[in-house]
Amino acid sequence: MIDRRALLASTLALASCGAGEAPATPPTGPIRPLKAVAPFPVGTVAMSGQLSDQDWFRLVSTHFSQLTPEWEMKMEYILQEDGSLRFDAPDRIAYFARDLGVRLFGHALIWYAQDHPWFTAIVNDRPRFIAEHDRYIAEVAGRWRSQIIGWDVVNEPVEDDGSGYRDCVWSRGLGGIDAYIIRAFEQARIAAPEATLFLNDYNLENTPKKGAAFLRLVERLLKAGAPVQGIGVQSHLDIEIPKGQIASFMNEARQFGLPIHVSELDASLKRGGRLPDLRPRAQRREQQTARVAELAGAFMALPPAQRFAFTVWGVRDSNSWLRRGENDDGQDSPLLFNDEGRPNPLFGVLTEAFAR
């Protein structure tokens, strides 16, 4: 997931984008469970502290058929300073998913943003670095090998602007960009042979240059024999990107024939660092629903075998990572349900798209 960085932006953002779109209104009347409408798994994320929230549980159990641990399956949580591994919180989420009868998706094994001190301290000792890297993947991916149906093996390898690939502790310790990604996938394949292994990134549809760089990387890895088995499209959508840009990327991504996971959907109503947004909220909602409708339509247009899952990065607006921190004014509404758990317009957009 996008962490410790500014809200989504695109060099192609247009202030006029969305003008004339159909009005965005919350659904009325009886609400059908989203998981009953969609012909594929519909996911959301969980933190262990949310599992006892009865209102959150009601929404999750009604509408979703897959769970991704939002943070507590990442290295930042699991790997301790002494090299030991902590599994208390991710185990609770795994048990919760099992008892609820929903799929569990693993996120994420290797991420440039989490260059843990345990690894930075040994980056110049190649044999030890390799051994510790392989041990970590073996123990983490192997722990839930009978339950987890897929993993984000490498998260966010492409530079923000699409100019290249991220230099990180993993590339330095394992001999280069391709080398670290290939090794991570090979080790994940050994540890979790039944899981579908994903390369996951953000802004692929928001920034065409980055989307193209990501797909070139996928092609190169496949030619090198890496067991990349799926494409993770995070879809933290910039609502101001031009119409058709999302569908264009999805059409390019489908050419590999790999399963595609919309893995972290949200759509902020804010401009995030650009000029103050003085437009009426209704206009921004229209843009938001139009872009999410385009994403859902593009996903529905994929061959059924390529529709791995469609995951929303949070349940209620108040659960969103976009609403955390001292600068949150409580006004953003990037998810399917509002703070009180009532459906937002985005819920109706997905219900309509998935029912076609």
Please give the residue ranges for each predicted region.
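Conserved, mostly hydrophobic/aromatic
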Residues: 67, 97, 151, 231, ...
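N-terminal secretory signal peptides and thylakoid transit peptides that target proteins
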Residues: 1-15
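Glycoside hydrolase catalytic-domain groove-lining segments
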Residues: 178-186, 190, 194-196, 211-216, ...
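Substrate-binding cleft and catalytic face of glycoside hydrolase catalytic domains
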Residues: 68-72, 92-196, 202-204, 269-272
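N-terminal substrate-binding region of glycoside hydrolase catalytic domains
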Residues: 36-91, 96, 103, 109-124
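C-terminal segment of N-terminal export signals and the immediately downstream linker at the start
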Residues: 19-45
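Acidic-and-aromatic substrate-binding clefts and catalytic sites of carbohydrate-active enzymes
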Residues: 45-56, 75-88, 158-160, 204-213, ...
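Aromatic-rich peripheral "rim/lid" segments of glycoside hydrolase catalytic domains that contact
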Residues: 143, 152, 157-162, 166-174, ...
